[in-house]
């Protein structure tokens, strides 16, 4: 009788070990995925910053051209 109990206990322990091993593997996969997603987020943030700088530069250029155009229109009205 005690041998049966021991075998059942051993089977449960082995099942627990197998479950723990699978969970550890899943944790490692999730860590890798998390690292990958973190890198993607950082890359997207970097691209966004670059686009914001480019946008600001283009806005400054547009403002400069608008000022020049207004100056030219003002001269044309004087003539």
Swiss-Prot record:
Q: Where is the composition biased (Polar residues)?
A: 36-45
Question: Sorted alphabetically, which Gene3D superfamilies does this protein's record hold?
Answer: 1.20.5.340
What highest taxon heads this organism's lineage? Answer: Bacteria
Residue ranges annotated as compositionally biased, kind Basic and acidic residues, are 46-57
- Coiled coil, from the record: 3-79
Q: Sorted alphabetically, which keywords does the UniProt record give?
A: Cell cycle, Cell division, Coiled coil, Cytoplasm, Septation
Biological process (GO) annotations?
division septum assembly; FtsZ-dependent cytokinesis
Q: Main subcellular localization, coarse class?
A: cytoplasm
Quote the InterPro entries the UniProt record gives: Cell_div_ZapB
Q: Which GO terms describe its cellular component?
A: cytoplasm
Pfam families according to UniProt:
ZapB
- Ranges where the record places region Disordered: 36-63
Location(s), subcellular:
Cytoplasm
Question: What is the stated purpose of this protein?
Answer: Non-essential, abundant cell division factor that is required for proper Z-ring formation. It is recruited early to the divisome by direct interaction with FtsZ, stimulating Z-ring assembly and thereby promoting cell division earlier in the cell cycle. Its recruitment to the Z-ring requires functional FtsA or ZipA.
Record's family?
Belongs to the ZapB family.
The record's subunit annotation is: Homodimer. The ends of the coiled-coil dimer bind to each other, forming polymers. Interacts with FtsZ.
Designated name of the protein: Cell division protein ZapB
| Organism, scientific name | Salmonella typhimurium (strain LT2 / SGSC1412 / ATCC 700720)
Gene that codes for this?
zapB
């Amino acid at each position: 009788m005690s041998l049966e109990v021991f075998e059942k206990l051993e089977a449960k322990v082995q099942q627990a070990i197998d479950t723990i091993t699978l969970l550890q593997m899943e944790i490692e996969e999730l860590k890798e995925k998390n690292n990958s997603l973190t890198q993607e987020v950082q890359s997207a943030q970097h691209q966004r910053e670059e686009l914001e700088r480019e946008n600001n530069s283009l806005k400054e250029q547009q403002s400069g051209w608008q000022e020049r155009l207004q100056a030219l229109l003002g001269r044309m009205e004087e003539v």
